[in-house]
Amino acid sequence: MKTLLIHSDYLEFTAKEKTKIAEDAEILNGKMDECLTVFIAVEKEDESDPVAVIKNAVFEIIKTAGNLNVKNIVVYPYAHLSSDLGSPETAKEILKGIEKELSSSFEVLRAPFGWYKSFKISCKGHPLSELSRKIGTERIEKEKKEKVVSKFYIINGENSELTEVNDELLSKLKDKGLLALLKHELDIKEEGKENGEPPHVKYIKEKEICDYEPSSDAGHFRWYPKGKLIRDLLSDYVYNLVVENGGMPVETPVMYDLQNNAIREHADKFGERQYRFRQGNKDLMLRFAACFGQFMMKKDMYLLPKHLPLKLYELSTYSFRYEQRGELVGLKRLRGFTMPDMHTVCIDMNQAMEAFENQFWMGLKTGDDFKTPYSIIFRFTNEFFEENKEWFFKMAKEYKLKYGKDAILEILPGRKHYWVGKVDMAVVDSFGRPIENPTVQIDVESAQRFGITVHDGDKTIHPIILHCSPTGSIERVLCGLLENAYIKTLEDKPPALPTWLTPIQARVIPVSERNEEFALEVVNKLRESGIRTDFDDREDSMGKKIRNAGTDWVNYVVVIGDNEMESKKLTVTLREESSIKQPKKESLTVGELIEKVTSEIKGSPNRPLPLPMKCSVQPIFR
């Protein structure tokens, strides 16, 4: 934003003629004496964070008015100050926002936007009477530090007892997950835990899962066959889970036009961390979630109460957040990611709370299935909590009964977001820091903003909408799985993924050439049974082959020699039942091995091995 501030004896204007971008204005002429006249040009870069621009502009205007001892202010749109103008919609939003913020302390006159106007001005002519300012989107330091003053509690589900969080409680809290979450929320940093590379970053490279793509923007990844398989299996898992719970899959675009008021306003709720660009005469943004497309789809639907709750689901591939370069950390924080995103339309708050509870349990189930238990934090506005505390206590009690764990409760004094209540679930990484994954939110704003309606007889209702990601981003799920695998090594357990997610579930290793024919028969039987199996035909020592299987995190390593051929009993190393120092081995027939593996992966998504069967011809990607 460019501004020109004139300490004026008076400013007088008359609106003469509309342009095609003119606002409908009630005040078409006006005069103000003894005033600070602020000529304003809203620029393209202001679109990334209009809220910050408004606050920064108001800060500068108030400071100047105070220095000049002025109580009257004229806000005057003046496009000639810049050659890089923002969109008319953003300009109107910012000018009205400045007027509104100033009106609480000053007499304000705003000239209409988009009109040809005549004006007269008398400048006082002293050294401070003419000032120019460049206003940016950077949050002023005061606002950067400004936070909603929330209160945090530990909720004991057994007796509905709330204990407010303080230093004494933190020093005695034994639940590492809750402690990590609270330290994150309270911005308590521990020396040595903010630096260093998390173990999962080493794993994704070493195991040929994925890696940074140097020819792309920072925070974007290339995915190798093993990683693509894992990601696809996780995506299949969420798809099945959501459809089983009534979700209807859809697909929507990855970019949106910021000229659409609803899209721009919703995008502005998320601040400056967005990919925005200009193409031709359009200002576009890359989505950071599937909200935009799903809301536009719902806007065009003719919804009746019998259709609700209505759940639309999309695997948002990809979503984008322009995270700061210094904040990018492996799969935990990146700029391009895959977000499972479901939005549920509810007729009223009672239906929304019922759906919230169901989706809360659905989110917890994902932690059970991934073997990555969550710690949870509920967040409610004070008004919502007071009205619905019995419902919350019931949910907390059921959670305690099932998981034996307490939860965190955050109470916000008022609503600063589009939601009145939400729950976040997190796993804890090897540095003791939370990785927030599943979330459910009760949105009371977006239906009205996007024009989503439900027709109930002669009434038209703006419904309540739930936002739900049952797992969080696919990349963060994998991050949590790999961090959990590392934590196992601290307990003398070999790192491993759940068998249904492990790229190579079984590897068959012949002791000598004469064992190969029988070994290949075993390979084929395992593969025919849907078990991802490869065959180590490399000319390495037996010790090296077994070590390679360990490096590849193979869950079932089958060694076949003369004894196995004769007895038809296979020597199988079971990775997940082993310790680092003592491998667990069993003697199994092919049928018993197939039964063991298939029973373990039963009910989970399955895909074939996307690599050559023979290890000797599997390519090396790094």
UniProtKB/Swiss-Prot annotation:
PROSITE patterns in alphabetical order: AA_TRNA_LIGASE_II
Compartment annotation: Cytoplasm
Documented EC number(s): 6.1.1.3
Top enzyme category: ligase
GO cellular component: cytoplasm
UniProt cofactor note: Binds 1 zinc ion per subunit.
Gene Ontology terms: biological process: threonyl-tRNA aminoacylation
Cofactor entry: Zn(2+)
Pfam families cross-referenced by the UniProt entry: HGTP_anticodon (PF03129), tRNA-synt_2b (PF00587), tRNA-Thr_ED (PF08915)
GO MF entries: ATP binding; threonine-tRNA ligase activity; tRNA binding; zinc ion binding
Taxonomy, superkingdom: Archaea
Main location: cytoplasm
Residues that coordinate or bind Zn(2+): 291, 343, 467
Comment field on protein domains: The N-terminal domain is an archaea-specific tRNA-editing domain that hydrolyzes incorrectly charged L-seryl-tRNA(Thr). Catalysis of tRNA editing is performed by the charged tRNA itself.
Stated family: Belongs to the class-II aminoacyl-tRNA synthetase family.
Subunit (UniProt): Homodimer.
Protein name: Threonine--tRNA ligase
Origin species: Methanococcus vannielii (strain ATCC 35089 / DSM 1224 / JCM 13029 / OCM 148 / SB)
Gene: thrS
